Each structure stands twice: as C-alpha cells, then as structure tokens.
C-alpha cells in the first residue's frame, strides 16, 4: 500500500484510505484466498447468521436451476442437489416454495437463472449490457522488501483517474493494491518457464497494483452478454473494443508510472 502512496505523492496524484469491512483482523494477508479468521465481514458471518437467529432456514448444497413461474409471479425455485464437495450435481431435486423470491446470483448467475427459467423478457434484454469493471494488474519489483502477502491489502486507493476523466469520455479507473498471496501472484504474472521462476524468486520484493475500469458509461462501452451453453451453464461474451483496450493501456501506464516513481526497477502486466 505504501508504494501506491509514495508513487502517487511523487506524481501529484490524489489518494485516500479505504474503510475496510473487518472486525478483529489479524493482518495475515490471506484475504484473496478467503479470510481464515472470519474477520472479513462477509454475508457468511453477518447476514446469514442473523437470518438464522430470526427463524430463517438455510438450504445448502443445492444449485438453483430455474424459477417456478406462474405468469409474472415467482412461486419458488427448483434446485438440484450437489455432492458433498458442492461441485457435482446429483440426481436429487429440491423444490423451495416461498411468498417472495430474491434473486442475488451475481452479474452472470442472475441472468443465467432467468434465461433457464424462460422468465418474461419482452424487450429481450436479459443477459445483455453486462458490466463487470474489467480489471488490470501491474506487478513491479522494488529494491526494498514488500512482502505483499503479509499485512492488510487494499487499505489505500486512488480515484484520480476517475475524477479527471468525464463519465462519458475515456474509460476512467480506480487504482488499489490487491491481496497478493504467492499462489495469486504465480497465476497472474504474464510469464512462463525461467522468466516465471525468476519473477517468483523475487516475490518478497514484488508490489502489485490493480485498476478497476469504469465500463458502461460510453456508447463504445456496450458491456457483454450472458448466454447459456447447451447444458444450461452460463457463458459470458464480453467484446474488448478499441475503447476498452485504450482504457487497459492507460491503466497499465498509470500504475507503472506510479510504481517507477516509488522506486521500482521493473514492472510488467
């Protein structure tokens, strides 16, 4: 996080602190792999236990297959039971009926369930205009030890490149410092063979920054479309237009400049 701060200040770029949604954080740096101490205040340890304490029933190890529809009314959800690992479906079916159904399956899972259910779609918009804030990463080697796998990640940010770009102009982006567990670093670096091994040998000195690109506010940023495969699982078609590519290039350039301003000896996407 300090690399972002130092680089931003040297370039005259504004930055700020992120209010982290935690309680009793041990600063282990495993955030990207799932919090091992339940300090991260996710729905798993906040909303769901609260609901259970107030009479809710949690149906787990099932996959929602389709909504039970009566015209425009949703009567429940038909589900498929999963194996103990929650990976492979079994032959068992589970039907959940309710007075109210709230669909919260994310930007890809939600339209997929609506498509499988053949829900009313008079304007043929289900699954279209899917926006995901495309993300770019720049990894840099610093002369000092960073040990990015220790401590709290994503505690600083910069919205400079959001505030200096009009909403309907070039694609703006937010810059943060992601959690960098060694496994996450190893699968995200654009290298292989000896180059990959050399990079990982320098891991204690590696800083990473990520940019969250603001899509959906320009006529050339039309987003993607969620479709169904032959087996009913979702797939995403997200065309990378020249407009999006320009945002990708600008974000990588901005992060690289901040890293070099902070003393980096090498940076790579």
Language-model segments: residues:
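Surface-exposed helix-capping loop/turn segments at secondary-structure junctions
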Residues: 11, 119, 257-269
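Short, hydrophobic/aromatic-rich segments at coil-to-beta transitions
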Residues: 72-78
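Hydrophobic alpha-helical scaffolding
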Residues: 34-41, 103-104, 241-245
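Residue-level marker for well-ordered alpha-helical positions
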Residues: 2, 45-46, 108, 124, ...
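Conserved redox-cofactor binding core of oxidoreductases
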Residues: 1-66, 74, 267-269
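Non-transmembrane alpha-helical segments in soluble domains
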Residues: 5, 48, 52, 114, ...
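Glycine-rich loop(s) and the adjacent beta-strand/alpha-helix scaffold that form part
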Residues: 37-38, 53, 62, 66-67, ...
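FAD cofactor-binding and catalytic pocket of flavoenzymes
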Residues: 98, 123-259, 266
